Amino acid sequence: MTANELTTGDFTEASEPFSLFGTWLKEAEKSEVNDPNAVALATVDPDGMPNARMVLLKGFDERGFVFYTNFESQKGQEILATRKAAMCFHWKSLRRQVRLRGPVEVVPDVEADEYFVSRPRGSRIGAWASKQSRPLESRFALEKAVAEYTARHAIGEIPRPDYWSGFRIRPLSIEFWHDRPFRLHDRLEFRRKAPDGDWTKVRMYP
C-alpha cells in the first residue's frame, strides 16, 4: 500500500465547508446520470421514529441548504415540530458523500415566491392538487384535482399556496467523505456550536 492510497489530496485542506461543497456539487453535475442535487432528508416524528426520503436541493450558500415542500406533508409537519433535520448526499460516480445536520428555518415568503414562479406550470398546479402524504382514493382522484385546478388557473399567474414553501437547514456539522482503497476512507468534518459561529475542522477515522 502506498502513501497515495492513504491520502486523498487537496480536499482535506479546505478551510470552510461551503466552497468545498460547491466544488463537489459541480463535479457531480458532470458525472451523475440523474439529479446530482438529489439528497436524502431525515426527520423524526413525535415518537422519535426517524423518517427519510429523497428531495432535491434547490439552493445553498453560507446561510444553509434549501429545499421546498408542502408544509402539510409528513416531512413538513415533522420539521415544523422539531425544527431540526439532516441530509446525506451520495454521488456514486465520484465515490463521495456529504452529510450535514442542524436547525431548520422557514425561508422568507419573497424567496419562496421567486422559486415557485420559476417552476413549470404543471408543477405549480400540482402543488395545489396534491394533498401530500394523505391517503389517496385513486389515481383518477388525483388527476381530477389536477384538471380542476388547471381550469381554475387557466389564465394568469398561479399563486403559491400558503402551505407550500421552503426550509433552510443551517448546519452545525458538515462531513465530507471520499472512498479510498481497503476501506481507509477520508473523512473531514466541519463543526460549529451555532448557525453563525466559526467552523472547527476535524479529520475523522474512517
From Swiss-Prot:
- Name the enzyme's class: oxidoreductase
Keyword Oxidoreductase among UniProt keywords: yes
Sorted keywords for this record are: Flavoprotein, FMN, Oxidoreductase, Pyridoxine biosynthesis
Q: What Pfam families does the annotation carry? A: PNP_phzG_C, PNPOx_N
Bound cofactor: record note = Binds 1 FMN per subunit.
Pathway(s) served: Cofactor metabolism; pyridoxal 5'-phosphate salvage; pyridoxal 5'-phosphate from pyridoxamine 5'-phosphate: step 1/1; Cofactor metabolism; pyridoxal 5'-phosphate salvage; pyridoxal 5'-phosphate from pyridoxine 5'-phosphate: step 1/1
Requisite cofactors = FMN
Q: Which GO terms describe its molecular function?
A: FMN binding; pyridoxamine phosphate oxidase activity
Top-level lineage group: Bacteria
One Gene Ontology BP term is:
pyridoxine biosynthetic process
* Catalytic activity, reaction form: pyridoxamine 5'-phosphate + O2 + H2O = pyridoxal 5'-phosphate + H2O2 + NH4(+); pyridoxine 5'-phosphate + O2 = pyridoxal 5'-phosphate + H2O2
Check the record and name the Gene3D superfamilies matching this protein.
Electron Transport, Fmn-binding Protein, Chain A
The subunit structure is: Homodimer.
What is the role of this chain? Catalyzes the oxidation of either pyridoxine 5'-phosphate (PNP) or pyridoxamine 5'-phosphate (PMP) into pyridoxal 5'-phosphate (PLP).
Q: What is this protein called?
A: Pyridoxine/pyridoxamine 5'-phosphate oxidase
Q: Which organism is it from?
A: Sinorhizobium medicae (strain WSM419) (Ensifer medicae)
